[in-house]
Amino acid sequence: MREAIIKRAAKELKEGMYVNLGIGLPTLVANEVSGMNIVFQSENGLLGIGAYPLEGGVDADLINAGKETITVVPGASFFNSADSFAMIRGGHIDLAILGGMEVSQNGDLANWMIPKKLIKGMGGAMDLVHGAKKVIVIMEHCNKYGESKVKKECSLPLTGKGVVHQLITDLAVFEFSNNAMELVELQEGVSLDQVKEKTEAEFEVHL
């Protein structure tokens, strides 16, 4: 299920892109890049993230914004968070791939908190959804109770309003334009009826 999401998201990466991968599921996209010159950026001050380290090759001083150990590629650079967010807010990041708790049919995103649950803070997502040239959200289509996370309106606090360009789930791929949500692709083995059944949001079909 997650593998299908990650592999589909990796297809959106293009040669020469500067890309920020959000915490959690999005970080796994970096492992799918092979033979392309993609530069991955992290909010904690790193340009040039590599794949996850193999066992025995972990450097505890090399971490991403989610405090996971990583590797770096030749030519990687390190800098402070102020410079990192200047890159993001200045529009220098081509693509941000973020996780999501809910996405609405208008392209609203909620991905930073659930009320009454302890959180560490909002992180860099609010900057990324407004600063990156394109925002892709990847997530499972339904929550653990089987309820759709693709909503008419988000019920959780918003990260950004009308900021999502593309949504990739384990069932389908949606694109957003002019406040309309369009189904453009089905995941392998998934039917249109399944997507309609599991989606609260209203969408147009452009398969």
Curated annotation (Swiss-Prot):
A Pfam family assignment: CoA_trans
Annotated PROSITE patterns: COA_TRANSF_2
Catalytic activity, reaction form: a 3-oxo acid + succinyl-CoA = a 3-oxoacyl-CoA + succinate
Enzyme Commission identifier(s): 2.8.3.5
Keyword terms of this UniProt record: Transferase
Database matches in InterPro entries: 3-oxoacid_CoA-transf_B (IPR012791), CoA_trans_fam_I (IPR004165), CoA_transf_AS (IPR004164), NagB/RpiA_transferase-like (IPR037171)
Top EC category: transferase
Disulfide bonds: none
Keyword Nuclease: no
An annotated Gene Ontology molecular function: succinyl-CoA:3-oxo-acid CoA-transferase activity
Source superkingdom: Bacteria
Range of residues in the leader sequence: none
Family: Belongs to the 3-oxoacid CoA-transferase subunit B family.
Subunit structure: Heterodimer of a subunit A and a subunit B.
Protein name per Swiss-Prot or TrEMBL: Succinyl-CoA:3-ketoacid coenzyme A transferase subunit B
Organism, scientific name: Helicobacter pylori (strain J99 / ATCC 700824)
